[in-house]
Swiss-Prot record:
Keywords: Methylation, Ribonucleoprotein, Ribosomal protein, RNA-binding, rRNA-binding. This is Large ribosomal subunit protein uL11. One of its GO terms (biological process) is translation. Forms part of the ribosomal stalk which helps the ribosome interact with GTP-bound translation factors. It comes from Brucella anthropi (strain ATCC 49188 / DSM 6882 / CCUG 24695 / JCM 21032 / LMG 3331 / NBRC 15819 / NCTC 12168 / Alc 37) (Ochrobactrum anthropi). CDD domains: Ribosomal_L11 (cd00349). GO terms for cellular component: cytosolic large ribosomal subunit. One or more lysine residues are methylated.
Length: 142
């Protein structure tokens, strides 16, 4: 018989930096999930990823207090800020430009995010990434 799901929890955790301190510890603890077990499993699974990059993770926890988790790719905004060497986007997107990004870099980001995006092909994924870039005040050139 399959385990009964008690719920799901979505967190964004830095790769290789899961520890029992807030906000991870309290979020897991109040649901009865073993905090250290999650931290060790997450850090081991995120070992291959760039240290410190924000990783969205969906934790499914069961009534017997066990859990499974699925890691996604970092958010598009993280990739865009990294590609354009920015600390943050424009305060007034559409009016003030925060910088520029090439279509080649947009394609690279789209290829990295393809499995998490709801897009049929790479061109559709690129349009989604370009929309996010415009929302941040980035200008897509080339």
């Amino acid at each position: 018989m399959a385990k009964k799901i008690a719920g799901q929890l979505k967190l964004q955790v830095a790769a290789g930096a899961a520890n029992p301190s807030p906000p991870i510890g309290p979020a897991l603890g109040q649901r009865g999930i073993n905090i250290m077990e999650f931290c060790k499993a997450f850090n081991a699974a995120s070992q291959e990823m760039e240290k410190g990059s924000p990783i969205p993770v969906v934790i499914t926890y069961y009534q017997d207090k066990s859990f499974t988790f699925v890691m996604k790719t970092p958010p598009v905004t993280y990739f865009l800020k990294k590609a354009a060497n920015l600390k943050s986007g424009s305060k007034t997107p559409g009016k003030a430009s925060a910088g520029t990004i090439s279509r080649d870099k947009v394609r690279t980001i789209a290829e990295a995010k393809m499995k998490d995006l709801n897009a049929a092909d790479i061109e559709a994924a690129m349009r989604m990434i370009e929309g996010s870039a415009r929302s941040m005040g980035l200008e897509v050139v080339g």
